[in-house]
UniProtKB/Swiss-Prot annotation:
Induction: Expressed very early after infection. Encloses the DNA at 45 mpi. GO terms for cellular component: host cell cytoplasm. This is Chimallin. Homotetramer. The tetrameric protomers further assemble as a square grid. Self-assembles to form a proteinaceous shell that encloses the viral DNA and compartmentalizes proteins and DNA during viral infection. This micrometer-scale compartment contains narrow pores and is the site of viral replication, with the proteins involved in DNA replication localized inside. Provides a surface for docking of capsids during packaging. Probably protects the viral genome against host defenses. Residues 32-59 have a biased composition (Polar residues). The lineage of its organism: Viruses, Duplodnaviria, Heunggongvirae, Uroviricota, Caudoviricetes. Keywords: Host cytoplasm. Residues 1-63 are annotated as: Disordered. Residues 1-29 have a biased composition (Low complexity).
Length: 631
């Protein structure tokens, strides 16, 4: 059933008949005016209340036009997907109208229902429809600055629009429309369709989005119905087969379902390979690739401690390098041929991020690139904030691997931190929301316990032997909110996150005050978040140009190093043995490696890898389900 709430009719109904030919009739006689003095004065609750009292059919704002077009497009795409791609015709597409329900933006709702223990359960995935023709009121923040008060105006982003009130109204509407007023509504993760996406020209992307949205509903329904979880025991493969992790260093972004660019300097792909290197099917690789995780390496400046000598004859301790590498995870996904996205599959894919420590792959994006006039990743910019106080010419002909190694060793601490950008409105909204809850808040304990349960499902149990989540966090918030969006480098659409700390240092060209201004706009806790965001966007325009467009927000969180290392050891002991396909050691064999952990969240070693896949034993685990979400 595909229903338009503006007309309360389904798409399969016949088109209305044409209006009859115009006829001239005698004007009706005037009726005596009735007195209205005795009637109570109506109450108008905002614009919507006035429109309800004084009904007119036209809407000059045009806020409903994009939702109407989206419903038409998705209706056609559903027919195609059912006919051509074996998509089951057991879901509904509903139009949740902003004017009818008095919310910021309309959405299309992909809804699928089952009966669980006699109770109807409806999974919904709202596809939010930001609309450039609708000007939402800005959020105003008063900031006291000495004797004066500054007013900061902030744009409303899609995550703010999708509030608890929005979801509650959407849930009631879905229940009533599907005739299940007492049904339990579970969220399969909201996802915005970019305002600048031309719907009629993007049918391939939107058809994939429709199919993935139906699968997302299946994922959350399967979670509630007790589907047997994915386990690594099922990856033992056939004789002569192994799992390999391939590390690619890229300059081009990945893209999500609707074409948003995703920064992906490092991509670790897990795949099945034959030990002799031969494919079982020469031109068919659907069953080869399993998953991938994308990252980039940011550099964080650390406060420099003064070296101290407690006794006159004591040797002075060397000050640690001033920069810490942060490996930021930007994308976690299964191979296109895998329809399901379960929590266990997510943790399997994410665990491979730690493999970027093997051969110090996390540092490889900083290797000098020749022929690039304006290199945002030029590691030579670190020279501006060193004792040299000048850029190091990494493009020079005599700048070799040994010099690169010396530069890295002197300026960057050898053990990276692992971070992740979590987006409640993204492709992996369910897992991102779960981790944000675990990072702090009223659901922190439940969320952390749920994550541990999912990892136990993946490996067969016993993760608590490697990591005790009751005494330490899985991950922590940094207070850094990341603007998601894009910019154009010539004709190429790229991720706004290209502007990281090293890129800003390159752009500042030695102006240290300017760099610190940029850095403070990212995470200075002494500045109000709205003020930081305004300053950050000013730097975006200064460094990236006027083409910057914002599509949402993510929160950057830092993984506990003990959790990342424990996950690697746990999966290795459970039988997950992976070889590295194409890694190399930097600096002509020089070991770019630390001897101890520096800081609370820097990992202390490298991922475990194996020469062959030897896991043959199976594991059994009791799958657990919870109420409304993962809990």
């Amino acid at each position: 059933m595909i229903r338009d709430t503006a007309t309360n009719t389904t798409q399969t109904q016949a088109a209305p008949q044409q209006a009859p030919a115009q006829q001239f009739t005698q004007a009706p006689q005037e009726k005596p005016m009735q007195s209205t003095q005795s009637q109570p004065t109506p109450s108008y609750a905002g614009t919507g209340g006035i429109n309800s009292q004084f009904t007119r059919s036209g809407n000059v704002q045009g806020g409903d036009a994009r939702a109407s077009e989206a419903l038409t497009v998705f209706t056609r795409l559903k027919e195609q997907a059912v006919a051509q791609q074996d998509l089951a015709d057991d879901f509904s597409i509903l139009r949740f109208d902003r004017d009818q329900h008095q919310v910021g933006w309309s959405s299309l709702v992909i809804a699928k229902q089952i009966s669980l223990n006699g109770q109807p359960v409806i999974a919904v995935r709202p596809l939010i429809l930001p609309n450039n023709s609708i000007e939402l009121p800005k959020r105003k923040t008063n900031i006291v600055n000495g004797m004066q008060t500054d007013v900061i105006e902030s744009d409303i982003d899609v995550g703010t629009v999708f509030s608890a009130q929005y979801f509650n109204r959407l849930s009631t509407y879905v229940q009533n429309t599907l005739g299940k007023p007492g049904a339990k509504v579970v969220l399969a993760g909201p996802f915005p369709i970019p305002a600048d996406l031309v719907l009629k020209d993007s049918e391939l992307q939107l058809r994939n989005l429709l199919i993935k949205s139906v699968n997302a509903c299946d994922d959350i329904l399967a979670l509630h119905s007790g589907e047997r979880p994915f386990t690594i025991a099922g990856l033992k493969g056939q004789q002569g087969e192994t799992l390999a992790a391939k590390v690619d260093i890229r300059t081009q972004p990945l893209h999500d379902t609707v074409g948003n660019p995703i920064r992906a300097d490092i991509v670790v792909t897990t795949q099945r390979v034959r030990r002799n290197g031969q494919q079982e099917n020469e031109f068919y690789e659907t069953d080869v690739k399993l998953n991938q995780v994308a990252m980039f390496t940011n550099l964080e400046r650390t406060p420099q401690a003064q070296a101290q000598t407690l006794f006159p004859n004591q040797q002075q301790v060397a000050t640690p390098a001033p920069w810490v590498a942060s490996v930021v995870i930007t994308d976690v996904r299964n191979a296109d041929g895998i329809q399901a996205n379960t929590p266990e599959m997510y943790w399997f894919a994410l665990s491979n991020a730690f493999r970027s420590t093997h051969g110090h792959a996390w540092a490889r994006p900083f290797l000098p690139m020749t022929g690039v006039a304006k290199d945002m990743k030029d590691i030579g910019a670190l020279g501006w904030m060193s004792a040299l106080r000048n850029r190091i010419d990494t493009k020079a002909a005599n700048f070799d691997d040994a010099q690169f190694g010396q530069l890295m060793l002197s300026q960057v601490q050898p053990n990276p931190v692992f971070q992740i950008d979590l987006n409640r409105m993204g492709e992996t909204a369910q897992m991102d929301s779960l981790q944000l809850d675990a990072a702090g808040g009223p659901n922190a304990q439940k969320a952390a316990a749920t994550i541990i349960r999912q990892i136990n499902n993946l490996g067969g149990g016993g993760f608590e032997r490697f990591f005790d989540h009751t005494t330490q966090p899985i991950l922590e918030r940094t207070g850094q909110v990341i603007d998601l969006g894009n910019w154009f480098d010539g004709d190429e659409k790229r991720d706004r996150r290209d502007l990281d700390n090293l890129a800003a240092l390159n752009a500042a060209e030695g102006n240290e005050n300017e760099f610190w201004g940029f850095y403070g706009a990212q995470l200075n806790p002494n500045l109000h978040p709205d003020l930081r965001n305004r300053q950050s966007r000013n730097y975006d325009r200064q460094y990236l140009g006027s083409t910057v467009t914002y599509t949402g927000k993510a929160e950057r969180c830092t993984y506990n190093a003990k959790f990342i290392e424990a996950l690697d050891r746990y999966l290795a002991e459970a039988g997950l043995q992976i070889t590295m396909d194409n890694t190399s050691v930097l600096n002509s064999g020089q070991r770019f490696m630390g001897n101890s952990v520096i800081g609370n969240n820097m990992v202390s070693g490298q991922a475990q890898v194996h020469s062959a896949y030897a896991g043959t034993q199976g594991f059994n685990t009791q799958y657990q389900t919870g109420p409304s979400s993962f809990y």
